[in-house]
Amino acid sequence: MLANRFIYLFLDPNRGEIVVFKTPPKARLRCGAGGTFVKRLIGLPGDTVRETDGRVYINDKLLSEPYIRPDRRDRNPTQVFKVPKGQYFMMGDNRQQSCDSRSWGSVPRKNLIGEVFAVYWPPNRISLR
């Protein structure tokens, strides 16, 4: 993956972007990994994020997620999260396997490194965003 490390110096992140970020301490404890993560930005500061039966709702409106395959949706019980000011809610696209904000909370703006703009591996997934 290639990420634009400068974009968030000038622009606010947008919902749906794939973001590289420094892992918060809770993520290191819950996921057993540290350093950086790559996840999709789902919730913006002030949003209420609810996941019910594999569907995500932002402020009680269904979020269109054409990038999530039906077999990758998580069927956990309903979860509700309020995104604090200056923080972002991240989720992986493979919801059943992803260790993300549902497990360890939101990500502070200062932890955002950049937006992914190109994928070059594996070769069958080469794309520009």
Provide a role label for each language-model segment:
Residues M1-R129:
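Soluble "head" domains of membrane/secretory-pathway proteins
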